Structures are given as structure tokens and as C-alpha cells.
């Protein structure tokens, strides 16, 4: 690593520690040329795939959009904010785990439905009715019957 003081490449790590609950490494470094010390931070760069919308356009994954849809389905339901965040983080983890640069928006919808099914069945039906475009009562009945199994 280049020294920020004299720009030489002669630096060595003199101390390393985990920070941010183990998601970052803090390193103290010393320049072998000017002997100045400085701190660097390292963290894994995990990329969330882009979303391929149903019309074929592509857009960056939008965590706020996902959160809004899930919270809308959970409106006035007894689910904690902590549980919502865990569900969102689990969806993001699954998207990263695909290893793909792009994923269809349908995958995000399915992952959200799976998480909602675990959190609250009523919220799941609300979300499914919009996501699956229910247009009659029979579709609600079919989905509710699936939940009973």
C-alpha cells in the first residue's frame, strides 16, 4: 500500500483488529521510508445484482423499494421492526448468493413472499394479491388454501 505521506510503497502492517462486528478489519501501518503511521480499513465488497424488470429494463437493486413494499403489506400487523430488517437482510443475502450480475424482479418478489409467509400470513396474502395480480376472490381462496397445507 502507498504511504499517504511520502507515496512510497514500503509500508508494513503493525497491528490488525476486527471492527464493526467483524465485518471490517482495521490495520495500523507504518511507512518504512518516512516512518509515519496511518490507519486503513478493509471490508468485503459484496455486490447486489441489478434487477431485470418485467419490461426488460434494468435498474440497480433498491433496498428502500423492497422495504416499502414489505412494510406496506405489514401495515397494522404485529411484526417488529427488527423482524422486518432481518427479513430484508435475508433477501439481500440470498440475492448476493446467486452470484449473478443481474436477476429478474420476479426473484425478488418470490423471496419477499417467502419471508412474509414466515413473518405474517395476512401480510403474505396482502403482498401476494398485488404481486400475483389477483383479480377475483377465487385467487385469494386458492392462495389461502395453500397456506393451510
From Swiss-Prot:
A zinc finger (unnamed) spans 3-34. Its cofactor is Zn(2+). The keyword Transcription regulation applies. Pfam families: ATP-cone (PF03477), Zn_ribbon_NrdR (PF22811). It comes from the Bacteria. Keywords: ATP-binding, DNA-binding, Metal-binding, Nucleotide-binding, Repressor, Transcription, Transcription regulation, Zinc, Zinc-finger. Residues 49-139 form the ATP-cone domain. Binds 1 zinc ion. One of its GO terms (molecular function) is ATP binding. GO terms for biological process: negative regulation of DNA-templated transcription. InterPro entries: ATP-cone_dom (IPR005144), NrdR-like_N (IPR055173), RNR_NrdR-like (IPR003796). Negatively regulates transcription of bacterial ribonucleotide reductase nrd genes and operons by binding to NrdR-boxes. Belongs to the NrdR family. This is Transcriptional repressor NrdR. It comes from Haemophilus influenzae (strain ATCC 51907 / DSM 11121 / KW20 / Rd). The gene is nrdR.
Amino acid at each position: 500500500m502507498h504511504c499517504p505521506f511520502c507515496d512510497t510503497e514500503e509500508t508494513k502492517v503493525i497491528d490488525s483488529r476486527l471492527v464493526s462486528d467483524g465485518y471490517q478489519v482495521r490495520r495500523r501501518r507504518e511507512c518504512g521510508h518516512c516512518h509515519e503511521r496511518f490507519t486503513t480499513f478493509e471490508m468485503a465488497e459484496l455486490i447486489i445484482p441489478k434487477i431485470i424488470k418485467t419490461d426488460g429494463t434494468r435498474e440497480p437493486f433498491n433496498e428502500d423499494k423492497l422495504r416499502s413494499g414489505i412494510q406496506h403489506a405489514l401495515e397494522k400487523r404485529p411484526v417488529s421492526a427488527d423482524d422486518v430488517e432481518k427479513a430484508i437482510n435475508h433477501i439481500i443475502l440470498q440475492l448476493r448468493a446467486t452470484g449473478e450480475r443481474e436477476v429478474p424482479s420476479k426473484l425478488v418478489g418470490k423471496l419477499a413472499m417467502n419471508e412474509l409467509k414466515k413473518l405474517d400470513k395476512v401480510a403474505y396474502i396482502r403482498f401476494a394479491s398485488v404481486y400475483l395480480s389477483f383479480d377475483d376472490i377465487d385467487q385469494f381462496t386458492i392462495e389461502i388454501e395453500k397456506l393451510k397445507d
